[in-house]
Amino acid sequence: MKVGIVGATGYGGLELIRLLSQHPNVEEIICYSSSQEGLPLDDMYPHLSGNVRWTLKAIDPEAIRADVDTVFLATPPGVSGELTPDLVKLGLKVIDLSGDLRINEPDVYEAWYKRQAAPVGTIRGAVYGLTEWQRDEIAAAQIIANPGCYPTAVLLGLAPLVQQKWIDPKRIIIDAKSGTSGAGRNPSQITHFSEMNENFKIYQVNQHKHTPEIEQQLRNWDESVGNVTFSTHLVPMVRGIMATIYAEANQAISEKELREHFAYVYETSPFVHVYSEGRYPATKEVFGSNRCHIGVTYDERTNRITVVSVIDNLVKGAAGQAIQNYNVMNGYEETLGLEGSPLYP
């Protein structure tokens, strides 16, 4: 199959190129850009130099339809909301890595993103692509709203608890840390080397755009879930997310039962690994991979469950999960093109 990447010059688009280049069922990758049409992508990014000349093409829905079967949209907020309706009318499958189609209610999207929402019909036609929990829906979908990086780590960590109603749904606290690539490619003061090196900072306190996405999906599993406390931090590394999640148990449970339940739930999920007693994941253990590693513990003294969930924000949190969804949409093995081990050290 031939695939297109709109927004190929950002970190998410570049990661799509890296991973799709290794996919045995992808015969050609065509890259599109709104501002750099005609430029050789491998001149901008020498790591892409090799046998293929990655020349950027203009974004034109009719031309894209003539080129490819599936389009990955790795675009800034607002772009895919405008582009997706035209692509869908032309019969293309669309996997959107932006936040434009993740929030079901337009007024909620507009309140958090401070921009006009996509057409309601497009939003409602999109399937939220948290692969481990939406396989059947994804297999039948034409449009995938690929989850955000933080929500991926958080939701995979919380799903086994929320679905079983084992925790107080009104008192969920999420403390998350991310590498600087999560802030995107465009330079800013917050990601400037002199500001970030040997530093650790909280940002978008009580205002992170991924908050309503997390709450929406949690409420799909348990409508009694309240507003979550969600804190995000930047740490001086390039890749990786660690979400440490705290919740109060609402029934008697042992740590052994917790771990066994997590392991059972994710037994058929090739990219999710649940750690054994006394072990907790580190971001380096998933670096460059589509994996999510999870550790869970229960503190009898405080009656709190702690879940630690780590992913690579550019892979499982973006491009890798998008390709995982692409595989499911097309009836391929879920792991196709994503089998590589994490980079270590």
Swiss-Prot record:
InterPro entries: AGPR_AS (IPR023013), AGPR_type-1 (IPR000706), NAD(P)-bd_dom_sf (IPR036291), NAGSA_dehydrogenase (IPR050085), Semialdehyde_DH_NAD-bd (IPR000534). It comes from the Bacteria. It comes from Halalkalibacterium halodurans (strain ATCC BAA-125 / DSM 18197 / FERM 7344 / JCM 9153 / C-125) (Bacillus halodurans). GO terms for biological process: L-arginine biosynthetic process. It is found in: Cytoplasm. This is N-acetyl-gamma-glutamyl-phosphate reductase. The gene is argC. CDD domains: AGPR_1_C (cd23934), AGPR_1_N (cd17895). The keyword Oxidoreductase applies. It catalyses: N-acetyl-L-glutamate 5-semialdehyde + phosphate + NADP(+) = N-acetyl-L-glutamyl 5-phosphate + NADPH + H(+). PANTHER family: N-ACETYL-GAMMA-GLUTAMYL-PHOSPHATE REDUCTASE, CHLOROPLASTIC-RELATED, N-ACETYL-GAMMA-GLUTAMYL-PHOSPHATE REDUCTASE, CHLOROPLASTIC-RELATED-RELATED.
